[in-house]
Amino acid sequence: QTILEEMFIPFVIGRSPHDAERIYEDLYDSQRVRGYFGGFALDAIAGLDMALWDLRGKLLGQPVWQLLGGKRHDRIPAYVSGLPGKTVAERAALAKEWMDRGFSALKFAGAVADAGELVEMAAIREAIGPGPKILVDLHWHYTALEAIRLIDQLCAYDLYLAEAPVAPEDID
């Protein structure tokens, strides 16, 4: 609440929600001197942006998807995010359950892979078979070189995507 009140509400008060794009740009630009790649400030900006689009839709009597240009796809791919089992075996079994329910992709958190990401990836791939996509969130845990080495090893299990392998500020 403090971030919103002290940093961003002054940019919004008195402005039209129909100007959501410009307001977002102003809010985002206001963070350039503080670093604008992540953190609570950008979370607050995202929340304000969504609220403005929602308000705009309510004022116009239209759903936000229409305001954003209308329907573009009949279906949108989705994946399961998170496997809250206590052990590798439980998480692999849960992955299989989700695939059996009709999902074709899942993401697991490398941070909770207590036996390591490779063991987790191998167990999940064995449980779900060769078709479904597997994504892993590495939670900014690695240096660039460590991430490259790990991702190369994960690719042996047909890794689809590695999310956040290095800190966003790590430009080396």
Where are each of the predicted segments found?
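Metal- or metallocofactor-binding catalytic centers and their adjacent structured scaffolds
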Residues: 1-59
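Active-site gating/metal-coordination segments in enzymes
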Residues: 94-107, 112-115
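Catalytic core of soluble alpha/beta enzymes
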Residues: 108-172
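Short, acidic/polar
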Residues: 86-99, 144-150
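Short, well-ordered coil/turn segments that N-cap beta-strands
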Residues: 72-78, 102-104, 130-132, 158-160
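Catalytic pocket of metal/acid-base enzymes, prominently hydrolases
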Residues: 53-86
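Active-site mouth loops of central-metabolism enzymes
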Residues: 38, 74-90, 109-110, 137-144
